[in-house]
């Protein structure tokens, strides 16, 4: 809606990350730039950061700090790639994901009637994971809430881990300043972790210079002492985890079904599976697929088996 106010068709196209990267690659080739210096994914990330900071191509080119930073990194033409990229997207009637935020801000900034309409439509605004919002999202929320100031946000400044994607911790830290009449409810009791873990987390986070004052606590068991294992590779880490698990299961006389390994990302499973297989430990993966059950891996293993088991011409003769 309202895309026509920005010069776009109402049925504009949305470029995903792959579409965006392809366009950036073609621009780098056209400008005859070295794609090792101007790595497309790096250029894409820089443009994304600029948009999330509401910096348009013209402003980027005039920003001495950004230009000096690009020059030091031997990429002085980032601003030109950004300008061409923005122009190509516009001519093609397309926006990428970051444009959806940037163009929304431009719309709310330049079209007061649109802003007034949406302020009435969205009198109450609820934002989850507020600590992960970027500057562009912050400004949208501020503009929409300017009339009624009825904003509820949920977040934890101690869990802000997406600054590399443009998240601004200042958004949640300045919430009371932005909305002076807002009430703050601190959820300080932890129902999941042992007291040892909560106290350790408190001792680390209290060293932050920029934080909201709170003291988390747990009424659960004290739990085991925290151990830190240092590993240099994912394979070494998996070996340490599996060896430790095996020793504990044997010492306690438990069944393997009573043991579990929790991991955060799916790509960690392969190293763990390999370590379990090497030690002959049976396992099942819950709510996910084994690395060796992926179709492409099964196909590849089948080809390898075929190569090893097929008789050679000499054997057939």
Segments predicted by a language model, with ranges:
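P-loop NTPase Walker
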Residues: 1-14, 21, 92, 115-116, ...
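Conserved P-loop NTPase-based nucleic-acid remodeling module centered on helicase motor cores
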Residues: 1-46, 55-59, 229, 243
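Conserved helicase NTPase motor core
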Residues: 69-174, 189-193
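Short alpha-helix plus adjacent loop in nuclease-associated cores
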Residues: 159-162, 287-307
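Helicase P-loop NTPase motor core
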Residues: 180-183, 188-282, 295, 307
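Single conserved hydrophobic/aromatic residue that forms the stacking wall/gate
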Residues: 308-317
């Amino acid at each position: 809606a309202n895309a026509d106010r920005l010069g776009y068709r109402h049925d504009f196209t949305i470029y995903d990350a792959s579409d965006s990267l392809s366009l950036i690659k073609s621009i780098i080739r056209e400008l005859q730039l070295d794609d090792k210096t101007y790595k497309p994914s790096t250029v894409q990330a820089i443009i994304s950061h600029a948009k999330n900071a509401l910096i348009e191509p013209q402003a980027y080119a005039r920003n001495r700090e950004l230009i000096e930073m690009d020059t030091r990194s031997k990429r002085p033409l980032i601003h030109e790639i950004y300008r061409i990229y923005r122009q190509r997207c516009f001519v093609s009637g397309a926006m990428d994901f970051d444009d959806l935020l940037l163009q929304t801000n431009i719309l709310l900034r330049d079209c007061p009637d649109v802003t007034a309409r949406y302020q009435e439509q969205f009198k109450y605004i609820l934002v989850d994971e507020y600590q992960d919002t970027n500057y562009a999202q912050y400004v949208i929320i501020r503009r929409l809430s300017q009339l009624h100031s009825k904003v509820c946000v949920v977040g934890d400044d101690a869990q802000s881990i997406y600054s590399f994607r443009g998240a601004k911790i200042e958004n949640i830290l300045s919430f009371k300043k932005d909305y002076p009449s807002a009430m703050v409810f601190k959820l300080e009791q932890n129902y999941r972790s042992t007291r040892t873990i909560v106290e350790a987390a408190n001792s680390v986070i209290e060293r932050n210079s920029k934080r909201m004052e709170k003291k988390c606590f747990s009424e659960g068991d004290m739990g085991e002492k925290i151990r830190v294992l240092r590993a240099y590779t994912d394979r070494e880490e998996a070996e340490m985890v599996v060896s430790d698990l095996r020793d504990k299961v044997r010492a306690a006389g438990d069944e393997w079904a009573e043991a579990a390994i929790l991991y955060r990302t799916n790509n960690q499973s392969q190293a763990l599976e390999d370590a379990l297989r090497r030690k002959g430990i049976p396992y099942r993966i819950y709510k996910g697929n084994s690395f060796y059950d992926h179709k492409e891996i099964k196909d590849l293993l089948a080809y390898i088996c075929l190569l090893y088991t097929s008789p050679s011409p000499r054997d057939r003769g």
